[in-house]
Amino acid sequence: MQKKAKIAVLCGIFLIVALVLGGVVYAWHNTFGKKKTEETPAPETSETETVTEETEESSSSSESEEETSSDTLPSETESTEETTAPDAPIEIKTIGTIKGDGYEGTKGTGKYNYGEALQKSLLFYELQRSGKLPENTRSNWRGDSCLKDGSDAGLDLTGGWFDAGDNVKFNLPMAYTASILGWSVYEDKDAYVESKQLDYALGNIRWANEYFIKCHPSEEKYFYQVGDGNADHGWWGPCECVEYQMNRPSYFVDAQNPGSAVTGETAASLAICSILFKDIDPAFSETCLSHAKSLYAFADKYKSDAGYTAANGFYNSWSGFYDELSWAAVWLYRATGDASYLSRAKEYYPKANQDFNWSLCWDDVHIGAAVLLSQETGEKTYTQAVEKHLDFWTTGTASGERITYTPKGLAWLDSWGSLRYATTAAFVASVYSESDVCPSAKKDIYWDFAVNQAGYALGDTGRSFMIGFGENYPVHPHHRTAQGSYSDNMNDPGTSRHVLCGALVGGPDASDGYEDTVTNYNTNEVACDYNAGFTGLLAKLYTRYHGQTLTGFGAGESVGEEYRVDTSVNAGGSDFLEIKALTYNMTGWPARAPKALELRYYFTVPSGKTASDLSVSSSFGQDVASLTILAGDGNTACVQVLFKERACYPGGQEEYKKEVQFRITGLPQDAASSASVALFEDGSLVFGQVPDGSGNVVTPAPTAPTQGPSDTTPAPTSPAPSGNGKVTVSIDYSMGGSGNAISGNMTIENTGSDAIDLGSLSVDYYFTNEKSGALAFDCYHSAVSRKDGNYAAINSVKGEFSKIEPKKTGADTSCTISAFGSGKLEKGDKLIVQFSIHHGDWSDFNLSDDYSRSGADKIVIRSGGKIIYGTEPG
């Protein structure tokens, strides 16, 4: 992480000492791409008794951060909101796998397939994204994360990239990364176009720069970090759950406490982004340029890093700020044509640190500035600086100074991220070797150096250091989310649950020694800046050697075990049964903290009794909101345990495992022999079995949700469509005749011969809003389940309410559910929507007379505005 300190970061040592072994053995399922093992809602039952008190509970609290108000730049904010260009290609019908299903494009002539390597390196940045992910994200194990970032400052600071294997957003290395990626596209756009990776590259660059714009709410205020590095590094868990574990403070620089290095680097990134998007999205380009100019003026005015303190110990600005001021000024000159920027670049360059025997990196960009200035001016000051630097990395300088080479050929600079330095120096060498100012005698030397360093990274030694590429690649990177621990322990599970495809690990020591272990952050951590120069190098090599890319590519994985419930009998007798139940949340596709987690313990009511004759009490319960006996059909009943909202999540020993002990009075001990358990996440069955009305245990079908025992709405056989397309609809409800929400798990299947445009689909659900209170819509989960087994989540679903006038029978309000993304619903594909309609105060509805509740054919499906299923209320 640091440039020259060569000291172990204290938080890293703390992790290794503090994290403890633990865990639960888990099994892998073969369901591809599903976020939940089943999609069956909790069957309808009626409440007979509720116990709301608990004797013990586990809770955690963290210090709240002081809120900071800030001004905004109105014109800039408006420009950002109006920008709607996609982050990546829209037509992602399914989430592919890292192996893909074939190759396309120009076959390569190089030693390695640089097209595939480039493709995978870009995917890594999608896996590092923070915030609300777009629907075209090519992964089923990454989810939305850190959606409250900036709330302590009254701002939306969501987005950006997580730095490395941690969950902090450090803007200095992030801006450097976005700058280098942008430089690569600027330099070798044709390589990205030919390999069909331009949209992905631009999507990643835009993702970072849109975040930087959020971080700059006023002329002289810039938020440079979100998350406390020490607190973050003291916890080992997935990014999707970090905000439930700790506060994420926001840190800023301003006129009183400036930070010229980080604001200068961000100005460079935004200037490059403005160039790249000038012809694609002019409005966004102008917004980027406006912020770039403002941030540069801020950095140039104060020339101080006095306020840049929160990153100390992680990303200190060792080289100062003049290198960033020179580097950013050249890019602003290229973006604007304003010669004053070129003059400032030349003025500040000699004031920057001039270490020729290091590498272009997040801290020191003076060599990057020298390359650009050599291209712009051809002056010897810059060409000689670049060549001395590259001579050091290749044949040696005139005075005999030369980089250390490992026995197997890696140009080795430092123990922390050795490959990051070598591949970035190789990128600089490849760019300079093709420039007009490079002496002909050195062109091949620099180019061959670039090829050789890429070869070392990709497999020349018998192993690839790029995850998911080549032979014998690393499988235990130091990365919290990819490792997938649920118990705050980097050794549990022992094998990473996810493949962090495309990431370049730190690399070997000076003797080619390398240890593929999660605990070694020197050699096996990954980081955004590690891949930056490496990506540029791959694109440059593609320009000469080409290479094919994978079709059906992505970070889609088979879903492993995510939930489990273990029960045992604590005690029992002829008239009571005491149960101990342990509920485990090991979710990882993606990791998540359920809003509603419900455990049900099903049993048979003794002959001669009813559920109302029984009572339940608890002697111990962790984060239990309520304990209730519910009557089912026939002689079945269950104990319903509702856990507190988002209390059970994969974040530690206490967080991922919840224990409850309860006693059922009136139930004999032998009832346990035929009992069963089921666990529901937001109304959908995720573990266990549900009994039918006769008491026999049935297992829900994995492809279609099982109907509840008393409230079923099977699909009608003859809907009345008026538009094109043919579908059937089934819906399962999680409530009975009354409740505080209309919660449904709806499946829409394309049974026709023609594909249906997902973007044109809408669903109208009709009901009565008796209290006329404010309404809210929640989509807990939505996805397309393909007939071939693939599964693609949808994150954009929304619901809009309309009054029906005059009122119809069973309907005075409609909820239109739409925004199912792009792509097609092919024949045999199913659109799954788990939704909830509720009042703002969660007051009850009378559900018994709702129009759409009376049958699935009373739910109207439209395609392109025309009804293709269902009947409107008359």
Task: Enumerate the language-model features and the residues they cover.
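Short beta-strand elements of extracellular/lumenal beta-sandwich folds
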Residues: 573-603, 731-732, 739-755
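Terminal connector regions
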Residues: 648-700, 810-813, 832-874
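A surface/secretory-pathway sequence property marking extracellular, secreted
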Residues: 605-647, 771-814
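Low-complexity, acidic Ser/Thr/Pro/Gly-rich terminal tails and inter-domain linkers that flank the onset
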Residues: 546-576, 719-740
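Aromatic (Trp/Tyr) and acidic
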Residues: 95-123, 127-183, 225-265, 269, ...
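N-terminal Sec-pathway targeting helices
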Residues: 2-15
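Ser/Thr/Gly/Pro-rich low-complexity, disordered linker/stalk segments of secreted
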Residues: 34-107, 697-723
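Hydrophobic single-pass membrane-insertion segments
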Residues: 22-39
